[in-house]
Swiss-Prot record:
InterPro entries: Ribosomal_bL35, Ribosomal_bL35-like, Ribosomal_bL35_CS, Ribosomal_bL35_sf. Keywords: Ribonucleoprotein, Ribosomal protein. PROSITE patterns: RIBOSOMAL_L35. GO terms for cellular component: cytosolic large ribosomal subunit. Gene3D superfamilies: 4.10.410.60. Belongs to the bacterial ribosomal protein bL35 family. One of its GO terms (molecular function) is structural constituent of ribosome. The gene is rpmI. Pfam families: Ribosomal_L35p. GO terms for biological process: translation. Transmembrane segments: none annotated. This is Large ribosomal subunit protein bL35. It comes from Phytoplasma mali (strain AT).
C-alpha cells in the first residue's frame, strides 16, 4: 500500500492552534500596501480561522498531521 503524504504546500500556509483550530493568513498583503488604507493593512495582520466548509478538505490533505 502506498504511503499517504501530507500536502506540502498546505503545510506551509496554515497553522494548527492549541485547540485544534486551523488558522490561515489573510490574502492581499504581500505587496502594493501603499495603495491600501492604514485600516485595511491593520485588519490584514495576524491569522484567521479557516471557514468550517473548508475544514474537512484540509484535514484530508493533512492526513499525517
Amino acid at each position: 500500500m502506498i504511503k499517504k503524504k501530507s500536502h506540502s504546500g498546505l503545510k506551509k500556509r496554515i497553522k494548527i492552534s492549541k485547540n485544534k483550530k486551523i488558522l490561515r493568513g489573510h490574502a492581499y498583503k504581500n505587496h502594493l500596501a501603499a495603495s491600501k488604507t492604514t485600516k485595511q493593512n491593520r485588519q490584514l495582520r495576524g491569522l484567521t480561522m479557516v471557514h468550517k466548509s473548508d475544514v474537512k478538505r484540509i484535514k484530508i490533505m493533512l492526513n499525517n498531521l
